[in-house]
């Protein structure tokens, strides 16, 4: 059974909701809808599900209930019925460095499942979602792809930067000040002030971290209105965008433009180029693969390497640079960047978008980057001539790994392994000064099944950066790295340790070599020794044996397959 194929007039704007609003046999359905305040006239109107990831406990999401009200007002003004509903969210910033991080990636698929569930059960004709934090965005798009009903994503927007002693702060400042403190570089009073001032209000983490990366990719993909990714959360333009979404979704209904008409192979290509140029998070690899699979578009980790090879890294945005998303909006925003990429022939812009026009048609009517801006370099003088995301393979990652290398760290690293079976052990070693320059830190059993949930390693990378070792230490994991992570880092190593991947066989002192020019990741141990180690290896017990994480362990695919759970 599929809820996406009702028996009704295929040309009607209410072809889904009419399944319950029109038949006399569905009187009970209609009685309950009348109870919500709908009128007899409303029963003939299209119904739009408005899915918000609002919850109070996270700055990224705490304002979404108000934005959902603005979206509903726009839907009502457009002559339709808006029905708000909520789904879950997990704050990566709050759960980072704790066992709570195991629930983060899993929340992406729960969001997709819950949106698909309510849209299918309630028979809404179209969907507008309001995500805030990292996993919210791909969760929304995966649901849209599965449902294939007219859909728009309205990003909750980015946070304003904080400030302390005339320096801009963001969430990564709050992470890194711990490493600075244990290294004796700042006092406890300074550390406390940085923490208090890093997040001054509502909105997602301010740099080109995962939330802004995914919002940017989704705008380039065509599933959000122009400027959605760069308008700050508390800017008046964000409320205006919410209200415009009503008329936009009406046009999609009239033209019967659906996610699978927009999310084409060409759209994913343009999205990948855009995020590479802006220095987006490695998490985009995982999420775009999952989104593509939801619409049956083939996309692999090798495709990211192909795009990276031909796309220069242009944007001086945090975490590797000094600007934040609000700064980018002030010089033209996401559309201005894409307009420049289109002019340079780096994206094609041929795919349909939620405006009912192609991306190129949208950009033709919008201004370019402001003259004299310092955030986005030219293609002729880039920060790096190729992309920062590298797909590595070798004896340590036979099925692939994802590195984030901007060029500031160098392109090769070789050194002795320092192996830790969880991030807590690594942090303890750092505090005890056991990690030295030249080391390759390995944090394993943090993959999709082993973590479980492939937790992010922002706390360890931030601690290393704060301790002044960022240029002298490499870090590898079968877990993920936050969009806020920077340094010489390699994640998404597959096969993961829990299933017996080579990362499980590393011992302290083994030489590991990372080469971002040859895209290789190798464990310098001979095959006979590795085979001897494998014969003694046994998988550790699963960290979850009941409940939602156990279900996730049983269902999740590998990182190279997007960690999807519905195949």
UniProtKB/Swiss-Prot annotation:
The keyword Metal-binding applies. Pfam families: ILV_EDD_C, ILVD_EDD_N. InterPro entries: DHAD_IlvD/Edd, Dihydro-acid_dehy_C, DihydroxyA_deHydtase, DiOHA_6PGluconate_deHydtase_CS, ILV_EDD_C, ILV_EDD_N, IlvD/EDD_N. [2Fe-2S] cluster binds at residues 60, 133, 205. Binds 1 [2Fe-2S] cluster per subunit. This cluster acts as a Lewis acid cofactor. Pathway: Amino-acid biosynthesis; L-isoleucine biosynthesis; L-isoleucine from 2-oxobutanoate: step 3/4; Amino-acid biosynthesis; L-valine biosynthesis; L-valine from pyruvate: step 3/4. This is Dihydroxy-acid dehydratase. It comes from Rhodopirellula baltica (strain DSM 10527 / NCIMB 13988 / SH1).
């Amino acid at each position: 059974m599929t809820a996406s194929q009702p028996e009704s007039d295929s040309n009607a704007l209410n072809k889904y909701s009419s399944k319950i609003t029109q038949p006399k046999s569905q009187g009970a359905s209609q009685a309950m809808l009348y109870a919500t305040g709908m009128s007899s006239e409303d029963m003939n109107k299209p119904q739009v599900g408005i899915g918000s990831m609002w919850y109070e406990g996270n700055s990224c999401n705490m304002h979404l209930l108000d934005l959902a009200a603005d979206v509903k007002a726009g839907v009502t003004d457009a002559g339709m019925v808006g029905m708000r509903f909520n789904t879950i969210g997990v704050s990566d910033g709050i759960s980072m460095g704790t066992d709570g991080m195991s629930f983060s990636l899993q929340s992406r698929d729960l969001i997709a499942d819950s949106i698909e569930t309510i849209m299918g059960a309630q028979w809404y004709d179209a969907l507008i979602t309001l995500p805030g934090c990292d996993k919210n965005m791909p969760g929304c798009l995966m649901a849209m792809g599965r449902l294939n009903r007219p859909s728009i994503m309205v990003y909750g927007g980015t946070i304003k930067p904080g400030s302390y002693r005339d320096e801009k702060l963001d969430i990564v400042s709050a992470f890194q000040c711990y490493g600075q403190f244990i290294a004796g570089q700042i006092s406890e009073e300074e550390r406390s002030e940085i923490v208090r001032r890093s997040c001054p209000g509502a909105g997602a983490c301010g740099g080109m971290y995962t939330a802004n990366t995914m919002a940017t990719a989704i705008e380039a993909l065509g599933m959000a209105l122009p400027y959605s990714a760069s308008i700050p959360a508390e800017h008046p333009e964000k409320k205006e965008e919410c209200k415009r979404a009503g008329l936009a979704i009406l046009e999609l209904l009239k033209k019967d433009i659906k996610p699978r008409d927009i999310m084409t192979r060409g759209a994913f290509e343009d999205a990948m180029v855009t995020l590479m140029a802006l220095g987006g998070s490695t998490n985009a690899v995982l999420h775009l693969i999952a989104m593509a699979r939801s619409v049956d578009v083939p996309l692999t980790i090798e495709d990211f390497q192909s795009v990276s090879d031909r796309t220069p890294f242009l944007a001086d945005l945090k975490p590797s640079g000094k600007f934040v998303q609000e700064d980018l909006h002030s010089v033209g925003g996401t559309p201005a960047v894409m307009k420049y990429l289109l002019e340079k022939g780096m994206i094609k812009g041929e795919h349909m978008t939620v405006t009912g026009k192609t991306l190129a048609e949208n950009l033709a009517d919008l201004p370019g980057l402001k003259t004299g801006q310092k955030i986005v370099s030219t293609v002729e003088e880039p920060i790096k001539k190729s992309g920062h995301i590298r797909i590595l393979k070798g004896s340590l990652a036979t099925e692939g790994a994802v590195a984030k290398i901007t060029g500031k760290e160098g392109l090769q690293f070789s050194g002795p392994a320092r192996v830790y079976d969880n991030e807590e052990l690594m942090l303890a070693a750092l505090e005890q000064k056991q990690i030295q320059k030249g080391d390759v830190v390995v944090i394993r059993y943090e993959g999709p099944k082993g973590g479980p949930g492939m937790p992010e390693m922002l706390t360890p990378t931030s601690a290393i950066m704060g301790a002044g070792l960022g240029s002298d230490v490499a870090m590898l994991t079968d877990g993920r790295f936050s969009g806020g992570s920077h340094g010489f880092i390699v994640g998404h190593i597959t096969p993961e340790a829990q299933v017996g991947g080579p990362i499980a066989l590393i011992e302290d002192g083994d030489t590991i070599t990372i080469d971002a020019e040859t895209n290789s990741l190798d464990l310098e141990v001979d095959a006979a020794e590795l085979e001897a180690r494998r014969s003694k290896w046994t998988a550790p017990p699963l960290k979850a044996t009941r409940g939602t994480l156990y279900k996730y362990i049983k269902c999740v695919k590998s990182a190279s397959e997007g960690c999807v759970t519905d195949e």
